[in-house]
Amino acid sequence: MELTAFDVETTGDGEWYGLQPWRVITGDARITSFATAEFDASGSVVVPDVACESKARIRAGGLLNPTTEGARKFLTSCHERKRTIVGWNTTFDAAWLIAMGLREEVYANHWLDGMLLWKHLTNAPESTRLIKSYGLKSAVARYYPQEAGYEAGVDFDAMDRASVQKRLRYNIQDACFTLRLTDLFLSNLSELPRRAVLLEAACIPMVAEATVSGICASGERAAALGEKLREVVRIAFVKVKITDGSVTPEILSSPKQLSELLFGKWGLTPIKTTATGAPSVDKEVLDTLAAFDPRAAILREYREAVNNLKKFSDNTLASLAYNGDGRVRPAPRIFSTYTGRMTYSSKMGTGSKEAPVGIALHQWKRGAEYRAQITAPRGYELLEFDFSGQEFRWMAVESRDQTMLKLCEPGEDAHSYMGAAIAQCNYRHLMQAVAEGDPVADGRRKLGKLGNLSLQYRTSRQRLQIVAKVQYGLPLTDEESEEIWRTYRRQYQNVPLYWKRQEYLAKRTGVIQNLAGRMVNLMQAPWPDHLTWPLSSTAINFPIQSIGADQKYLALAVLRNTLSAYDAYFYFELHDGLFIIAPRAKAEKAAHDLKAVLSDLPYKKAWGIDLPIKFPVDAKRGPSWGELKGVK
């Protein structure tokens, strides 16, 4: 792999505009310079004091105020010479090029992200992560400490000739360090993890384009939802006042005052503490308390109503007003969690200088009235492709449990199976009754779904009761929770063996790897007492949850070469689903064809493994996220 490092410096006419590539389209932002760097065995060095520690040298250079043609020339040269373009947070750089009108040239090239390579090598759960920042300056300080601080003295605003040249030199140094670090990281990756890296990197142009394009949102629907939610907030607060007349909105919005109310005045038992040792009142704590105390349930209802109003109505309207083009732009982040999942950030900056560029897309509620405000662009339809039973199927593969594997075959229903086992009734009869709309059968299947989705990660009996009450509206007695917990272990006997195997591997090697090659670093035994449970849980959860992320990246890599046949585009991704937009005239065919493609991904070619089961994809289409209909 021949690398060419690439880095842009940008500016804009408004605060934060220099970090918003879509502003190029309106002329409100621009690239002030870009720099490139390559290893050069001939020893030619454009920047004399930026040299590589190996025998090779670096040929580097930069261009001030590049034109579209200048950027096109660079991209065309890389394509013709079969170079892989590497950046640091490469999606950002690629997005600026796409905004300049160079979509075709960006897609024609291979891309890599040095920052993500570093994450692959050092990936760890939050509890044991040593690296707190994956910025380029942090990497230079860690691997080339003698050269740290090279950014000192750079003025990013001054326009005198000396300052401009100093910024250009800094830009070139960024490119050189990106090249050196990427080369170092690649040399430390074995073949299987490298496969995961390259598949992930194949998605960079698609994610960059989605960053520029944004997501259409209906301000009218967001405002209508807001009116409904304000009434919900009003009613919820009336309930709060009936419960305790001394409670005010200020108390409910202050963690300190809320803690004093719950654990002081009301005498409830704290569930956990914050980093400072104070009793926590986060969502998990309130969910737990609400499951057992009606007063806490009312407080939770109020806080959720207030949060829903702000997050799903007010913030949408604020983002639409800020962007000014009918779109919200939550910023997608590849490999954002330790499991590899993509997430979205909704804002830039903090406090009074906060820029509401997007919405909290990865936290969006399921209700149709919430989702209907997310629409396809005019003339397009929204297509959703969702991996059916994704985590259940991967647990079946990892645990090799024969019952689980059988339940992944066509015509089977794992939730009805578990529901029948819990209720001690006939599985096939329950399936039939569910299909006929029998409410009793549906309730039994719901218990089966609770068991299947909650217990495969070693959930305790007590936690199962909380999940049942909060997420499913099912109050369970201790005896019922115990029976579901035991039934799960009886039906899927290989799953507890998988748990033990993963804990053993983690303690022996300190590393867990999924089937696609993605790794997480834990620590070799002996483990401190306070980390034993979270580390063993990571060893169990990671192969299942992370392979779901890699399955998504593989799907996107396949779609990169497929969508153009339908004039379709990647829109966003969420949980188990991928969202595509296609012209209305081609949407039906695209939905059917892409469903077939995604249901038969090239796992053997990509990961070198033969899977014992299929991973079918469900498809939906419609004008908005809240109006999607199934595609058969």
Language model features with spans:
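Conserved "right-hand" nucleotidyltransferase catalytic core of DNA-directed polymerases
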Residues: 1-36, 40-48, 127-131, 142, ...
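Short hydrophobic beta-strand that contains or immediately precedes a catalytic carboxylate
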Residues: 5-7, 111-112, 382-386, 617
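Metal-dependent catalytic core segments for phosphate chemistry
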Residues: 17-38, 42-54, 384, 391-425, ...
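Conserved catalytic core of nucleic-acid polymerases
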Residues: 212, 269, 325-330, 334-337, ...
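Short amphipathic alpha-helices in soluble, non-transmembrane regions
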Residues: 590-598
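Flexible helix-coil linker/hinge segments at domain or subdomain boundaries
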Residues: 600-616
